[in-house]
Amino acid sequence: KIKDSVDEVIKIPIRYHRYLLPVPKIKIEKSDVFDFTKKSKFIEKFIKERLARNRRTLIFVPEIGMCKTSVLYLKNSLQDDIIIDFVYSEDENRSEKIKKFYDRKIDILVTTTILERGVTFDYLDVIIFDAKHINFTKSALIQISGRVGRKDYDNSGDIVFLSDKISGE
């Protein structure tokens, strides 16, 4: 029956800690959120709720040029004591920033797909900003989603695909 209703099924085995993979949620926002002309109440609420629960947030953006703009946007939306930074492949301070995030000295880290694999953070939730963007391939979205819930003592979390519409893919 499944084969009749979908194009493809991807089977992902259970993780080593025997907990299921967190399932991404889709949140539709108006398109002006993605060009930073309108604040997103959803993003603001999402981050505040995570911080209240002592969780961190990785926000994936599709292009390097969006990193700095996203940080400025978030700093204007959130309180001053929240520590926000960004990292991308050619960032000279990339290792230092990732370590600070790992050490919980950064609350929100905006990043490109450079962190889609090879890193493990606990107490982590993820937003994928403009998830329908061409730079977020199906495999990239799966890898990014895999950042959440990697520890046996923190085996769940939230993943949100933020978009202005649901694409056919």
Where are these regions (language model features)?
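Interdomain hinge/linker at the junction between the two RecA-like core domains of SF2 helicases
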Residues: 2-46
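Short glycine-/polar-rich loops that comprise or flank the Walker A/P-loop
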Residues: 4-7, 80-82, 122-125, 153-159
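Conserved helicase motor
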Residues: 62-65, 84-96, 110-118
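Amphipathic alpha-helical transducer elements in NTP-driven molecular machines
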Residues: 44, 68-71, 95, 108, ...
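A short beta-strand element within the Helicase C-terminal
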Residues: 108-110, 116-132, 158-161
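Conserved segment of the helicase C-terminal RecA-like domain
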Residues: 10-17, 145-169
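Loop/turn-to-beta-strand initiation segments
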Residues: 55-56, 105-108
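Conserved strand-helix element at the start of the C-terminal RecA-like helicase core
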Residues: 49-74
